[in-house]
Regions:
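N-terminal cap/lid subdomain of alpha/beta-hydrolase-fold enzymes
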Residues: 50-119
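Conserved acidic catalytic loop of the alpha/beta-hydrolase fold
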Residues: 131-151
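Conserved hydrolase catalytic core segment
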Residues: 148-188
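Alpha/beta-hydrolase-fold enzymes
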Residues: 173-257
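Active-site nucleophile elbow and catalytic-triad environment of alpha/beta-hydrolase enzymes
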Residues: 266-282
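Short beta-strand/loop motif that positions the catalytic acidic residue
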Residues: 286, 292-294
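Conserved alpha/beta-hydrolase "acid-adjacent" motif
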Residues: 299-306
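Catalytic active-site module of serine/aspartate enzymes centered on a nucleophile-bearing elbow/loop
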Residues: 317-354
Length: 354
């Protein structure tokens, strides 16, 4: 056999060894006459989704194996189809084995392949908040997929905040909740400030033209730079780019990728959506067991504030952990590295098993 053929076979075998989970099925659901909390309506709101596995119903017709996983700001359900996440959770014998669970990965309003400003409405697209996004997820499940119960709700970053909201808005709909990289409190202080930097950069940019630009405004670059910064782990970044030239090179490469696909209106809407997030007053409404996971190197949710540790005591069935800084953590992005926290997911699933 030729050396090239041997090398190709070895690479293919390595790929198969990693990709043990099945490929997702993709689809779209149209939600009719969607009313936003602002009072605005859309006659049709499209929600894109990915699923793995098959729903299983009990004798009463209740779906018992559905798992909803929601993504962060600027992301989509596609971000979970990667080795660090799906490869750790969705494969045979793993915690969320797709042969056992029905895994649902939606693209939120304004994200991915779901309806968003850049589809054509631009700033005529209704302003949306996290409550609207959760409502759309609920309607996707109940109207589009026929899911009337969730075994687990989990989410990362913005999706983590959605998880807290799910527990309050639909407290009897799920068996367990796992918010990652989020806090059960209103967006404030530094977390609000970096968002304001993004919002102000776009809204005060003459090139934005009230959202009616024909080419992306330069403020999109500022927004992408801020998103790059707040998602960073300082120790990892120092190791990755220890010189001025290397820092510029890594940032420029990241910007080149994000500027090709990003849209200023989409990012503006997504960042502004967090303004209605305020789970604090209603935490006691959460009934299901909840295990919150943050990381010590998260610039968005700094552990030194003590918010998570304080607020989790208000939940009779709530627990929380902050993963220590290590060579394996990835700052705010630790939420998608399942090897860091899957032991806590195991505990939650065992605790909440019927």
């Amino acid at each position: 056999m030729r050396p090239l053929s041997v090398a190709w076979l070895l690479l293919a075998a390595a790929g198969l060894a990693e990709a043990q989970y099945p490929a997702p099925t993709q689809g779209d659901v149209t939600l009719r006459d969607f009313r936003f909390t602002s009072g605005a309506t859309l006659p049709e709101l499209g929600i894109h989704y990915r699923t793995l596995g098959t729903p299983q119903r009990d004798a009463q017709g209740v779906v018992r194996n559905a798992v909803l996983i929601t993504h962060g700001t600027g992301g989509s359900g596609a971000q979970f189809i990667r080795q660090d996440f799906a490869g750790e959770l969705f494969g045979p014998g793993q915690l969320l084995d797709a042969a056992r669970y029905y895994i649902i990965l939606p693209d939120g309003i304004g994200h991915g392949q779901s309806s968003k400003p850049s589809d054509g409405l631009r700033t005529r697209f209704p302003r949306y908040g996290y409550r609207d996004m959760v409502e759309a997820q609920y309607r996707l499940l109940t109207e589009g997929l026929g899911v009337n119960h969730l075994r687990l709700v989990m989410g990362t970053s913005m999706g983590g905040m959605h998880t807290w909201a799910w527990g309050q808005l639909y407290p009897d709909f799920m068996d367990a909740l796992m918010p990652l990289a989020s806090l059960p409190s209103q967006i404030s202080a530094r977390n609000r400030v970096w968002r304001r930097v993004v919002i102000d950069a776009i809204r005060h940019d003459p090139e934005w033209e009230d959202g009616n630009y024909t080419t992306q405004p330069q403020s999109l670059r500022t927004a992408q730079e801020m998103l790059f910064l707040v998602g960073s782990n300082p120790v990892l970044r120092q190791r990755e780019m220890p010189t001025l030239a290397q820092a510029d090179s890594v940032l420029d490469a990241s910007l080149a990728r994000s500027m090709r696909t990003g849209d200023a209106n989409d990012i503006l809407y997504a960042v502004e959506a967090s303004a209605d997030y305020d789970p604090g007053p209603g935490l006691e409404k959460i009934k299901a067991p909840l295990f919150a996971v943050n990381s010590a190197d998260d610039l968005v949710n700094p552990p030194e504030l003590g918010i998570l540790e304080r607020e989790i005591t208000r939940l009779p069935r709530g627990r929380a952990v902050v993963i220590p800084l290590s060579d394996a953590t990835r700052g705010h992005g630790s939420h998608t590295v399942a090897s860091l926290w899957k032991q806590y997911l195991r505990q939650l699933l065992e605790e909440s098993e019927r």
